[in-house]
A protein has these predicted regions:
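Hydrophobic (often cysteine-bearing) scaffold residues that line and stabilize catalytic clefts
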Residues: 45, 49, 100-104, 108, ...
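Catalytic loop of the DD-peptidase/beta-lactamase superfamily, centered on the K-T-G motif
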Residues: 36-79, 177, 234-365
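Short, surface-exposed loop or secondary-structure junction motifs
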Residues: 81, 85, 126, 134-314
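Short active-site loop at a secondary-structure junction
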Residues: 58-66, 87-143, 152-162, 244-247, ...
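N-terminal leader/targeting segments and the immediately adjacent pre-domain N-terminus
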Residues: 1-92, 101, 114-121, 146, ...
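Glycine-rich, flexible loop segments associated with nucleotide phosphate handling
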Residues: 92-97, 214-220, 347-358
Length: 365
């Protein structure tokens, strides 16, 4: 596979955390200078955020990135950066489809929790009740959702997205359909017309009526790239070849905003269920663990932050952050793995992400 000099990255610059920190410092300086004049308007803050986000994208080795901010009424800001196809110089758009990778888990969690709400299963039900041959047969549904093991009084956290795949049989048993079809129905219900339940969905006979739309989504999907230390982008392949509970969902930032709104407005789950999903289990020493049911949960300067990330090695990445108290969400999708590194985020600290820190610094402070 040939390596294409990635013009969208502007220069062959190694991803450098010191450079990333300098961007954050410039943001802080810009905001410190703001009180000397009139306080910045919301549009000015979004313009500043977009400018620094684009600079950070370049430093992180991301050819193309789409982002949106959603409040309780809908999308308040959206912007796309760079190129979704470097060889053809195709600019990224906010309706460009990307692989969601690990963000698929939040959709899976919503399906499972809806089954719990409807009384079709409990969080204490063992996975073996649905799939006796599962490697996680002794684990409960709740343990899979929270990435924990051990006992209820002493849970142990270990982030392993592949464990989520055991939930396919749970959803299938609850809904009476395949896992893919259950996801497809959710996408249809939310009018997520630029999304598809797996990159191979067009080949599923149970979804034959949508095959043409799915092929159109594939044709418009961002090309995945592996970017080297010199900023050169080589076309690669998305790791997920099909839909599983942990990966494979294809969507856009505009479509994901519909899911976010439906979740926060109670159209998918009750407010009590969402609150429970966003409440982390507590270890035996009284400390909260970093992952709720489908979402990471932590606090930033005393404020709750709910988030999840996805990473397709050498191909794609995604990040979503919600601040429940403010009713605001940021979602970002990228066609390289520069947006979300598992080595830094899997432990459950969103502040390890320079993109999250930029969001906090510009739009939340």
């Amino acid at each position: 596979m040939s390596t294409v000099p990635c013009g969208v990255l502007r220069s062959r610059i190694r991803y450098d955390p010191w450079t990333v920190r300098s961007i954050a410092a410039l943001v802080a300086l810009a905001l410190l200078q703001a009180p000397l004049a009139l306080p910045p308007t919301r549009d000015q803050l979004f313009a500043l955020f977009g400018s620094y986000l684009d600079s950070l994208r370049v430093q992180a080795g991301i050819p193309g990135l789409a982002a949106a901010v959603i409040d309780g009424d809908g999308i308040v800001w959206e912007q796309a950066f760079g190129q979704q196809d470097v060889a053809r110089s195709l600019a990224t758009r906010t309706d460009t489809p990307f692989h969601l990778d690990g963000l698929t888990q939040v959709v899976t969690a919503s399906l499972v929790l809806r089954c719990v709400e409807d009384g079709r299963l409990t969080l204490d039900t063992p996975i073996g009740s649905f799939n006796p041959g599962s490697a996680d047969a002794q684990a409960t549904v709740g343990q899979i959702l929270t990435h924990t093991s051990g006992t209820a009084s002493d849970p142990v956290f270990s982030y392993r997205p592949d464990r989520f795949d055991a939930l396919a049989s749970v959803v299938s048993t609850c809904t009476g359909s395949s896992f893919r079809l259950a996801v497809a129905r959710t996408l249809e219900r939310l009018a997520m017309t630029d999304s598809m339940p797996g990159p191979d969905a067009a080949n599923d006979s149970s979804l034959a009526g949508d095959a043409g739309r799915f092929r159109n989504i594939i044709d418009r999907m961002a090309i995945p790239y592996s970017v080297d230390a010199q900023g050169r982008a080589a076309p690669s392949r998305y790791p997920a070849a099909t839909l599983t509970p942990s990966a494979g969902l294809v969507s856009t930032v505009l479509d994901f905003a519909k899911f976010d709104l439906a979740l926060r407005k109670g159209n998918l789950l009750s407010a009590d269920t969402v609150a429970a999903a966003w409440r982390p289990p507590v270890s035996s020493n009284g400390r909260p663990l970093p992952h709720g049911m489908g979402w990471f949960v932590q606090t930033y300067e005393g404020e709750p932050v709910v988030w999840q990330f996805g990473s397709g090695a050498g191909a794609s990445s995604s990040l979503v952050m919600t601040l429940p108290a403010r009713g605001i969400t940021l979602v970002m999708l990228a066609n390289s793995d520069g947006l979300a590194k598992p080595a830094t985020l899997a432990s459950g600290d969103i502040t390890a992400s320079p993109f999250a820190r930029l969001f906090f610094q510009v739009l939340i402070k």
